[in-house]
């Protein structure tokens, strides 16, 4: 974990790291994954998830409260700041107290400063201290050890059952297997991503706000994490094409203006005029917008198949879970054919989650995607365009447009919903549109449009991603994996509280 109040821009960090040619490859990977300057906690994975960096952008004293977690203890602290005389806010008694509370019996710390008041702060927290010879051009340094009686927690390899093989379930399976756990994933369909997700195309992009709120912070950080997550897979089923979001009405233009006023560096997005948007798309568009270069689209079924292609993941497709029973030290999960003994159970089964729980604030929404024929104008479109609806790049001989949003339970294509999709797409493209069918799927949405991620009665929950699962699910899966392991979570307490699965019960 690292706190950075004034983060490097990439070109400056490259210049600094160039002084250490021994670590050239590691330096390049770090710089390539360095998140943009946005307040909050960023999770970066290296070595196929075996090494994690939790990078917190913001003032140390302001962010500490958001990171307090009684279950997480750190092995070592390294305090590297300007001298206390120049940077006194980093060396406060409150920080020493936080470090003591977040340490176990084997935790150590070190720092180059040996200032008297710094030593006093750590002595008050019962750290044992030693003044040592410094390193390099430093004359001396301070080292210490925690006096905590809390034992260090060793992460043990476990057997974990996942119910549901959509993006949420498959990304969680991949992350857990990457950490060495044995995973059994169950789904009543004959393969991954067959039910709620189902479409051959999903856009991965953020819905941002210029204001700091749980929704805004989660939307930004899940977008940045999902883009890195798919990059790390090195898969052909993720296209980092960028996504163009048009400013087409009063609300979208107001949001666009607020975002542009909040971020002027064009690192997160590039503002395009109507002319520039048309040139980039390859056909005339009547609106400008924001182009998100790190966004893109996935083939969810093929991508999910890759995610669960691991020797540590046992796939139980066409096997519906019937009963889950919590025992004193394990779970018993029963299907029609067998019974499984598991250390943990994770429910990633969308609107079927209440077969085993009693969650409030969630509902099932129908979504119909329409297919239109490609043509000489559209065939060269390389990235999705979003407005009231979306237009995809070519998929075979067609494009996807959509999507409707209704309470209907019908699995049949409905002409009025095709008409609704065609009306939405007219904002983007209104020439020579030929309808070629479509597909119906169902989403699980929540009352506040944030997913449900966390633990209830010992069962881990990862549902309620709505139409944004391609963006939101990977970060929630990383969060669930850290809850299971008792390691540093990838979201701060501000966001974790907003994701709590029982939050609607609490509000009621």
Kindly give the residue locations of the regions a language model identified.
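Short beta-strand to alpha-helix junction loop
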Residues: 110, 214-222, 248-254, 289-306, ...
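C-terminal catalytic lobe of FAD-dependent flavoproteins
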Residues: 267-269, 433-508
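S-adenosyl-L-methionine
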Residues: 16-67
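Active-site substrate-recognition segment that forms the wall
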Residues: 141-143, 149-156, 161-179, 188, ...
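Helix-loop-beta segment of a Rossmann-like dinucleotide-binding subdomain
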Residues: 210, 235-245, 268-308, 404-408, ...
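Dinucleotide-binding Rossmann-like beta1-alpha1 core, especially the glycine-rich loop
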Residues: 201-280
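Helical element adjacent to the flavin cofactor pocket in flavoenzyme catalytic cores
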Residues: 290-336, 340, 344, 348
């Amino acid at each position: 974990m690292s706190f950075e109040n004034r983060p490097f821009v990439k070109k400056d960090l490259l210049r600094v790291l160039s002084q250490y040619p021994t670590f050239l490859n590691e330096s390049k990977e770090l710089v390539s994954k360095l998140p943009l300057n946005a307040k909050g906690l960023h999770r970066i994975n290296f070595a196929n998830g075996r090494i994690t960096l939790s990078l917190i952008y913001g003032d140390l004293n302001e962010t500490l409260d958001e990171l307090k977690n009684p279950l997480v203890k750190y092995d070592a602290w390294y305090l590297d700041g300007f001298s206390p005389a120049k940077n006194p806010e980093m060396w406060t008694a409150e920080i020493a107290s936080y470090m003591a509370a977040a340490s176990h019996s084997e935790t150590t710390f070190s720092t180059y400063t040996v200032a008297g008041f710094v030593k006093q702060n750590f002595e008050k927290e019962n750290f044992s201290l030693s003044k040592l010879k410094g390193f390099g051009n430093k004359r001396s340094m301070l080292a210490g050890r925690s006096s905590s009686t809390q034992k260090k927690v060793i992460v043990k390899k476990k057997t974990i059952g996942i119910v549901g093989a959509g993006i949420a379930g498959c990304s969680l399976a991949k992350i857990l297997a990457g950490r060495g756990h044995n995973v059994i994933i169950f789904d009543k369909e004959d393969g991954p991503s067959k039910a709620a997700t189902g479409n051959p195309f999903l856009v991965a992009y953020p819905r941002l706000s210029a204001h700091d709120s749980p929704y805004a912070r989660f939307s930004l950080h899940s977008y940045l994490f999902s883009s890195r997550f798919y990059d790390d897979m090195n898969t052909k089923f993720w296209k980092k094409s960028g996504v163009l979001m048009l400013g087409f009405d009063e609300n979208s233009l107001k949001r666009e203006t607020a975002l542009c006023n909040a971020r002027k560096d064009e690192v997160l997005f590039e503002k395009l005029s109507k002319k520039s948007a048309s040139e980039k798309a390859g056909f005339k568009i009547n609106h400008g917008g924001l182009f998100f270069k790190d966004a893109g689209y996935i083939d969810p079924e093929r991508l999910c198949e890759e995610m669960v292609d691991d020797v540590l993941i046992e796939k139980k497709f066409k096997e519906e879970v019937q009963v889950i029973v919590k025992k004193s030290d394990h779970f018993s999960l029963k299907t029609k054919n067998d019974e499984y003994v598991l250390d943990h159970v994770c429910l990633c089964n969308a609107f079927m989650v209440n077969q085993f729980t009693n969650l409030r604030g969630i509902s099932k929404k129908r979504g119909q995607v329409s297919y239109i024929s490609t043509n000489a104008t559209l065939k060269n479109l390389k990235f999705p365009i979003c407005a009231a609806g979306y237009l995809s790049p070519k998929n075979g001989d067609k494009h996807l447009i959509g999507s409707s949003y209704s309470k209907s339970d019908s699995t049949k294509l409905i002409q009025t919903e095709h008409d609704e999709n065609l009306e939405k797409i007219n904002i983007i493209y209104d020439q020579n549109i030929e309808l070629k069918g479509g597909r119906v799927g169902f989403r699980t949405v929540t009352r506040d449009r944030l997913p449900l991620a966390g633990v209830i009665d010992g069962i881990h929950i990862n549902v309620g991603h709505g139409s944004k699962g391609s963006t939101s699910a990977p970060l929630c899966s990383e969060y669930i994996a850290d809850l299971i392991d008792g390691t540093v979570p990838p979201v701060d307490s501000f966001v974790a509280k907003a994701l709590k699965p029982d939050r609607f019960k609490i509000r009621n």
